[in-house]
């Protein structure tokens, strides 16, 4: 998405800033010791930016915002955006972080509802090839299993880098395609407890993508149940394409006019008149809940990045179209039954 180059340019500027200023801390070279670009308020917590080396060639970028309350005792939350291939810095700077880009992108404003009010939050850019995460050999081909393994290694490396957090309560969180990543990751954590103890307390996923067949099918039913699709189109899909019952209909195998009708229903959520994340919320002419106008602002900072052109090509908030071939979506159910007793608190 072109509009995300706004944020990309900001993070490149942030990277340059980090290169020159972050390492001034004598206690931790990853600590951010100077004021962030565009920040318009005073911080009352420590924050960090650095890398977690998970193999000889792979380095995952992370940012940590310490709890404002009691970082020694408050929970540690790991956050992952979805995609697959979306940078978790989107979560940091546009959703739940302590500093958010304002509407026109001119400054970073304080978020009164930041998750780090009562928890230390770790934003990990995963898999390698997303954001500032990289592989020295250029091999960032991945799939769901590789991503889960890499995320587990990253979390273990985090606790080795920050052993003071090892006894804190831990929560694994994310959104969207994290519905695939995180149950797999949590399963690895549970199975690895005997070798690497993590004080896991919970898993939370917003708007999760859990199972392709179920998610796609439920979208059709949701659209009809909320009056998004007209009766004639619905009856056509139901009777002519799904043998009278949409529940259990294998939508992916539909062809011809049936496939076109299903696509038409899905497109009803992206026609610019409906907010796909909350149909009761007005989003004007925007096709989704967020306004991306602010992302254009950082294109005006390009003159400060002339010597970082190479990095600019590598840094990505989303895996772009030319890179999708590197990410294999397994698209099955990711839920491991062994997680049930863990999530039930047993």
PLM feature spans:
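Terminal and linker regions of secretory-pathway proteins
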Residues: 2-346
């Amino acid at each position: 998405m072109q509009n995300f180059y706004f944020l990309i340019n900001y993070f490149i500027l942030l990277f340059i800033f980090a290169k020159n200023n972050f390492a001034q801390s004598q206690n931790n070279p990853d600590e951010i010791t100077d004021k962030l670009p565009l920040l318009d308020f005073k911080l009352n917590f420590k924050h960090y930016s650095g890398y977690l080396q998970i193999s000889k060639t792979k380095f995952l970028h992370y940012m940590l915002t310490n709890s404002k309350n009691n970082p020694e005792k408050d929970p540690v939350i790991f956050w992952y955006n979805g995609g697959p291939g979306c940078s978790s810095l989107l979560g940091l700077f546009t959703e739940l972080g302590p500093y958010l880009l304002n509407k026109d992108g001119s400054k970073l404003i304080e978020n009164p509802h930041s998750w780090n009010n009562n928890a230390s939050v770790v934003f990990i850019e995963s898999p390698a090839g997303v954001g500032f995460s990289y592989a020295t050999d250029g091999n960032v081909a991945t799939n769901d299993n590789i991503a889960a393994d890499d995320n587990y290694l990253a979390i273990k490396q985090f606790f080795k880098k920050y052993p003071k957090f090892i006894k804190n309560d831990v929560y694994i969180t994310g959104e969207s395609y994290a519905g695939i990543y995180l149950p797999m990751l949590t399963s690895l954590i549970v199975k690895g407890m005997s070798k690497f103890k993590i004080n896991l307390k919970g898993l939370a996923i917003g708007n999760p993508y859990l199972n392709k067949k179920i998610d796609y099918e439920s979208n059709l039913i949701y659209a009809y149940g909320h009056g998004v699709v007209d009766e004639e189109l619905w009856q056509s899909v139901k009777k002519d394409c799904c043998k009278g019952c949409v529940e259990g209909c294998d939508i992916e195998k539909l062809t011809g006019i049936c496939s076109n009708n299903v696509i038409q229903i899905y497109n009803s959520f992206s026609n610019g008149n409906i907010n796909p994340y909350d149909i009761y919320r007005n989003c004007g002419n925007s096709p989704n809940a967020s306004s991306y106008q602010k992302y254009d602002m950082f294109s005006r900072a390009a003159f400060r990045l002339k010597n970082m052109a190479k990095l600019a090509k590598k840094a990505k908030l989303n895996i772009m179209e030319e890179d999708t071939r590197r990410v294999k979506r397994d698209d099955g159910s990711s839920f491991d039954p062994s997680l049930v007793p863990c999530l039930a608190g047993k």
